[in-house]
C-alpha cells in the first residue's frame, strides 16, 4: 500500500510538472505573439507564482523564455503594454531570492538600460527598474568593477546632463539615481583609485567621477590645486571638462 501511495505521489508530481511546463510554454508563446496578453490582469497576477513553480522544478529554460518575451514587450509602441510588461517583470523579480534577483537583474541590465533610453512615462515599475540598476551599479562599485559600472551610470548621466532629452519626471528620477550613487564613501573610493591607480582602474574611476557632475567638481578642483605634476593636472582638467560644466578659470 505504501509503495502504491508513493508511486501515485510521484506520478502526481510528474503530471503537475508536465502541466506546468505546458501552461508556461503556452503563456510564453502568447506573450511573444500577442502583446494584449499583458492586459489580462488575472493571468498577470498569477505570473509570479508560475515563475516560482518553474524555479522549484528547475525549469530555467522555460522561465527564461517568459522573462525574455516580457522584456521584448518593454519595447512595444503601445505605452500601456510597456507599462504592463514592466510591472509583470518587476513582480517576477521581486518574488525571487536576493541572490537570484541580483543574477537576473545583471543578466537583463543591458536590455533594461535600452528600455530606460526609450521610455516616456514614469510608472512605479519604471522607478523600480531604475532602483534595480542603481543597486547593481553600487554593487559593481563596491567590488571595484568600474568597467561594468560605466554603462549603467551612462544612461542616467545622459538624462541628468540633458544629453538625452526627457520630461521633467524622468529627469528627476535619473538625477536622483546619480545623487544616490554620488555618496561620500563612493567618491572617496573612486578618488583614491584615480589618484593612486592602485587597481589599474584610474581611467574608469575618472569616468565615473565625471558622471557624478557638480557633486564631485569641488573635489576635482581641490585635487587640481594640490597637484603639482603637469601630466596629472592635465588629466584632472580633462576630467573636469568631462563633467559638462562651464569652463572654469584656473
Residue ranges and their predicted role:
Residues 44-47, 129-133, 164-171, 184-185, ...:
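Generic helix N-cap/helix-start motif at coil->alpha-helix transitions
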Amino acid at each position: 500500500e505504501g509503495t502504491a501511495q508513493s508511486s501515485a505521489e510521484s506520478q502526481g508530481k510528474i503530471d503537475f510538472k508536465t502541466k506546468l511546463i505546458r501552461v508556461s510554454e503556452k503563456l510564453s508563446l502568447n506573450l511573444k505573439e500577442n502583446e494584449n496578453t499583458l492586459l489580462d490582469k488575472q493571468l498577470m497576477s498569477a505570473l509570479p507564482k508560475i515563475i516560482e513553480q518553474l524555479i522549484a522544478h528547475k525549469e530555467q529554460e522555460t522561465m527564461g523564455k517568459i522573462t525574455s518575451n516580457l522584456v521584448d514587450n518593454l519595447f512595444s509602441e503601445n505605452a500601456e503594454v510597456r507599462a504592463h510588461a514592466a510591472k509583470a517583470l518587476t513582480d517576477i523579480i521581486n518574488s525571487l531570492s536576493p541572490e537570484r534577483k541580483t543574477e537576473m537583474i545583471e543578466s537583463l541590465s543591458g536590455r533594461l538600460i535600452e528600455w530606460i533610453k526609450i521610455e516616456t512615462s514614469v510608472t512605479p515599475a519604471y522607478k523600480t527598474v531604475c532602483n534595480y540598476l542603481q543597486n547593481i551599479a553600487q554593487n559593481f562599485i563596491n567590488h571595484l568593477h568600474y568597467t561594468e559600472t560605466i554603462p549603467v551610470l551612462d544612461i542616467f548621466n545622459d538624462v541628468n546632463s540633458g544629453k538625452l532629452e526627457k520630461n521633467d519626471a524622468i529627469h528627476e528620477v535619473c538625477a536622483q539615481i546619480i545623487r544616490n550613487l554620488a555618496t561620500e564613501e563612493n567618491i572617496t573610493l573612486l578618488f583614491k583609485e584615480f589618484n593612486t591607480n592602485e587597481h589599474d582602474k584610474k581611467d574608469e574611476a575618472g569616468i565615473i567621477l565625471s558622471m557624478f557632475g557638480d557633486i564631485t567638481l569641488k573635489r576635482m578642483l581641490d585635487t587640481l590645486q594640490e597637484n603639482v605634476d603637469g601630466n596629472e593636472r592635465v588629466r584632472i582638467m580633462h576630467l573636469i571638462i568631462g563633467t559638462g560644466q562651464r569652463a572654469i578659470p584656473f
